[in-house]
UniProtKB/Swiss-Prot annotation:
GO cellular component, one term: cytoplasm
EC code(s) of this entry: 6.1.1.19
Reactions mediated catalytically: tRNA(Arg) + L-arginine + ATP = L-arginyl-tRNA(Arg) + AMP + diphosphate
Summary of subunit composition and partner proteins: Monomer.
Name listed for the protein in its UniProt record: Arginine--tRNA ligase
Positions of short motif 'HIGH' region: 122-132
Coiled-coil segments on the chain, per record: none
SMART domains, sorted: Arg_tRNA_synt_N, DALR_1
Species of provenance: Salmonella schwarzengrund (strain CVM19633)
Length: 577
């Protein structure tokens, strides 16, 4: 149940009846403060201006047409023309019952879309590092949310599996008589990459051989394709270990690397020329875009084919967008790529739209994100100034969580401790990132992320176990509880119920904006409201069975909401801590 949508519809109808245009925006929002009710309609200001009347006057007229019987206990006008809506306790009680009767907690399903989500995208022959963390876990939270809502989601792991570096790597492996790349660990490959690059830069004969190998690889030579495939396989096998550790839903089947689009590139260049969008300029093929200006104020030239016939990332990204619409039949495409790539993507998509490869009705959305910084406010590095490998970061998270859990549970069996430490450690790293607005940079801080206070994974995991402990202490007859009515008579019961019933609204925002921090903030709020409810509204020692059962049902919906919400973020819950 989306109460915000229900109220928006009711207020909109009343506004139209009061003389507002049919496309008026009621602007129904969750109220920021309890004294302003549960929801507030703020749309009177903009509409009253168009109608040439005072907002408060319009609000008064709207109220005469607004029928919220059975939904609101009170509706009042505040300030210059805000409409405050206070929900009826009986309505809240009924909605709590309905949510508990549904595995989906009453969350409705929107019109099903095919949504392609581009995320993670590590490079072949390199180990994943912290720079891949944000794209991987934010993208996965978006995927989980969209799938829960019922959409058909296609995960697209756009790995860097093509380019001149492969000629260089194959040449170096051959030189070392290590053609059987399948037996090598990725750590070896990283060393090979550095050595290969050094030789490529210093030894012209080696560089020439590497360039020849690229040509052979691109022409489809069986031997070179086989060597290339081995490099890709080693990398993806290693990456899958990291994905599994991170509790991320990506698999080998989701790999759609740059190489997938190679066969399309010559045709795209020819088509852009035929459409008059691409022209020859100084030997290269270029698209000049009026939408982007260079320093001189002239249209910016975007190269799609170099003098030597080579293609660029832009060409691949044009092909990629075209493929996602024409072959995957996407209704919407989301890209979780860092903010530094924004102009590059905008240029590629401008060309895509001009060429008619993807219609305007299909959104191409860059869900960009900021950087992960160290405590010094600079990009997060090792003490030696190197790139932090993702596997090393997760090892440290596990070790720190292990110490933390052992300290609080000295008698816990080793296997149980390991399982709990894994949930807490990995959860802490993910939640610390997901709880920040993705568009901003954030400071990576072990102490903060592993704290049991504040908006952290350990606190949220503990909050969940605390709710479960109520049920462990109570001798509950599940059937009797299922048929028991929900009674809302206390303010704290009403506040908790109203917030729990905003789960669907929260999911809708995350699905629309790709902002998992909104879900984190919501769950943290729910945990805090439950804490206040638990302290002020006795559950097991309630005055009678009816109140006890009703409060148990509120606790039950709290537990289910926390678990389901954390699951959409890819954060594991635990039964005990």
């Amino acid at each position: 149940m989306n109460i915000q949508a229900l109220l928006s519809e009711k207020v909109s109808q009343a506004m139209i009846a009061a003389g507002a245009p049919a496309d008026c925006e009621p602007q129904v929002r969750q109220s920021a403060k309890v004294q302003f009710g549960d929801y507030q309609a703020n749309g009177m200001m903009a509409v009253a201006k168009k109608l040439g009347m005072a907002p408060r006057q319009l609000a008064e007229q709207v109220l005469t047409h607004l029928d919220l019987s059975g939904i609101a206990s009170k509706v009042e006008i505040a300030g210059p023309g805000f409409i405050n809506i206070f929900l009826e306790p009986a309505f809240l009680a009924e909605q709590v019952q309905q949510a508990l009767a549904s595995e989906r907690l009453g969350v409705s399903q929107p019109t099903r879309q095919t949504i392609v989500v581009d995320y993670s995208a590590p490079n072949v022959a390199k180990e994943m590092h912290v720079g891949h963390l944000r794209s991987t876990i934010i993208g996965d939270a978006a995927v989980r949310t969209l799938e829960f809502l019922g959409h058909h989601v296609i995960r697209a792991n756009h790995v860097g599996d093509w380019g001149t570096q492969f000629g260089m790597l194959i040449a170096w492996l051959e030189k070392q008589q290590q053609e059987n790349a399948g037996d090598m660990a990725l750590a070896d490959l990283e060393g090979f990459y550095r050595d290969a690059k050094k030789h490529y830069d210093e030894d012209e004969a080696f560089a020439e051989r590497a360039r020849n190998y690229v040509v052979k690889l691109q022409s489809g030579d069986t031997y070179f394709r086989e060597m290339w495939r081995k490099l890709v396989d080693i990398t993806m096998t290693q990456n899958q270990i990291t994905y599994d550790r991170l509790n991320v839903t990506l698999t080998r089947d989701d790999v759609m690397g740059e190489s997938l689009y190679n066969p399309m590139l010559p045709g795209i260049v020819a088509d852009l020329k035929a459409k008059g969008l691409a022209v020859e300029s100084e030997g290269a093929t270029v698209v000049f875009l009026d939408e982007f200006k260079n320093k001189e104020g002239d249209p910016m030239g975007v190269i799609i084919q170099k003098k030597d016939g080579g293609y660029l990332y832009t060409t691949t990204d044009i092909a990629c967008a075209k493929y996602r619409y024409e072959t995957l039949h996407a209704d919407r495409v989301l890209y979780y790529i860092d903010s530094r790539q924004h102009q590059h993507l905008m240029q590629a998509w401008t060309i895509v739209r001009k060429a008619g490869y993807v219609p305007d009705s299909v959104p191409l959305e860059h869900h960009m994100f900021g950087m992960m910084l160290g405590k010094d406010g600079k990009p997060f590095k090792t003490r030696a100034g190197g790139t932090v490998k993702l596997a090393d970061l997760l090892d440290e998270a596990l070790e720190r969580a292990r110490r933390l859990v052992a300290e609080k549970n000295p008698d816990m069996p080793a296997d149980e401790l390991e399982k709990l430490a894994n949930a807490v450690g990995i959860g802490a790293v993910k939640y610390a990132d997901l709880s920040k607005n993705r568009t901003t940079d954030y400071i990576f801080d072990w102490d903060n992320m592993l704290a049991f206070e504040g908006n952290t994974a350990p606190y949220m995991q503990y909050a969940y176990t605390r709710v479960l402990s109520v049920f462990r202490k109570a001798d509950i007859d599940e059937q009797a509880l299922a048929s028991a009515p929900v009674i809302i008579s206390e303010d704290r019961e009403a506040q908790l119920a109203a917030r729990l019933l905003q789960f669907e609204e929260t999911l809708t925002v995350v699905a629309r904006e790709g902002t998992p921090h909104v879900m984190c903030a919501y769950l943290y709020d729910v945990a805090g409201l439950f804490s206040g409810f638990y302290e002020h509204c006795p559950i097991l020692s309630a005055e009678n069975d009816a109140v006890r059962n009703s409060r148990l049902k509120l606790a039950q919906l709290t537990a289910k909401t926390l678990k389901l919400g954390l699951d959409t973020l890819g954060i594991e819950t635990v039964e005990r801590m």
